[in-house]
Regions:
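Short, charged/polar micro-motifs that form catalytic or ligand-binding hotspots
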Residues: 10, 29, 116, 167, ...
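Short, flexible beta-strand-to-coil junctions
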Residues: 53, 120, 186-188
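Short gly/ser-rich loop at a beta-strand->alpha-helix junction or flexible surface loop bordering the NTP-binding
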Residues: 55, 71-151
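Residues in well-ordered beta-strands of folded domains
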Residues: 58, 115-117, 157-159
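Hydrophobic alpha-helical interaction segments
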Residues: 4, 134-246
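Short beta-edge/loop segments at beta->alpha junctions of small alpha/beta modules
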Residues: 8-87, 107-109
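Short, well-structured alpha-helical interface segments that form or flank functional binding sites
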Residues: 35-38, 121, 125, 172, ...
Length: 246
């Protein structure tokens, strides 16, 4: 069995295990699931394919040059994480920073905001604790008017952490790029800070530079009731080719 031939016979750059099985059956007429599992493991081991989502793989040539997204936390954000971990070691929360979007936009955002999403039962407790440590810097579920009057550079915005919010693979308290993409459409406060005219550039730059797990992204988008809107925006306003249109 020629595993190179099986992979080359898959016409799509992004494919499922079923696509690989269909390719093998097309070439050899008989192929078992056990053989398929072995084949997939060898492709991954040799760097010929990369897993990009649940039952979704990409040929290595497509992903080559794309990195796993990560960014540097500001000292202020590090201190926020440290304080929450110390006061509430068992609470679920995620952090990311507005300035990270400057990597993807033409019009740089002038100030930084630290987004802190906390599991619902813990929002008020975390707000009280951080307000003592950072007086005047903490806002709990702020309205647009409150943001205008009370937010400062490096202000901390506390919102409810929605279930299934995808975290960074290396740190569960840092938001993943998939969460950030969805929040651009779901977080009303964030939407007042970033021009919708910059969204196409942001999304195209993210997808061209970094690996994006679409399954994870759209699962979270469904939790925010934004899946259809995000799909429509990407399809109508960008050159991004989504892996799955399901």
């Amino acid at each position: 069995m020629n595993k190179v031939a099986v992979l080359n016979n898959v016409k799509k750059d992004y494919f499922s295990r079923q696509d690989l099985l269909s390719s093998a059956l097309d070439l050899y007429g008989d192929y078992t699931n056990t053989q398929l599992r072995y084949l997939v493991s060898k492709y991954i081991e040799h760097g010929e394919i990369i897993r990009v989502g649940h039952n979704c793989y990409a040929k290595a040539k497509v992903i080559k040059g794309k990195k796993t997204y990560s960014n540097q936390l500001s000292e202020e954000a590090k201190e926020v994480i440290s304080q929450v971990e110390k006061a509430y070691p068992f609470i679920n929360f995620q952090v990311w920073e507005l300035r990270w979007l400057n990597d993807f936009v033409n019009h740089l955002l002038a100030r930084n905001i630290i987004f802190l999403d906390v599991e619902n039962d813990g929002c008020e407790f975390v707000y009280s604790s951080l307000s003592e440590k950072f007086p005047g810097k903490i806002l709990l579920r702020p309205t647009t008017k409150e943001m205008t009057y009370y937010s400062t550079d490096n202000a901390v915005l506390i919102e409810r952490l929605v279930s299934e919010s995808p975290a960074n693979s290396e740190n569960i308290h840092i938001a993943s790029i998939e969460k950030i993409i969805v929040d651009l459409f779901a977080n009303k406060t964030l939407m007042t800070m970033v021009s919708k005219g910059d969204y196409a550039d942001i999304l195209e730059n993210i997808f061209s530079k970094y690996q994006v797990d679409e399954k994870k992204m759209f699962r979270y988008a469904r939790r925010r009731n934004k899946e259809a809107e995000i799909r429509e925006y990407i399809n109508n306003n960008t050159d991004i080719k989504l892996i799955s249109e399901d």
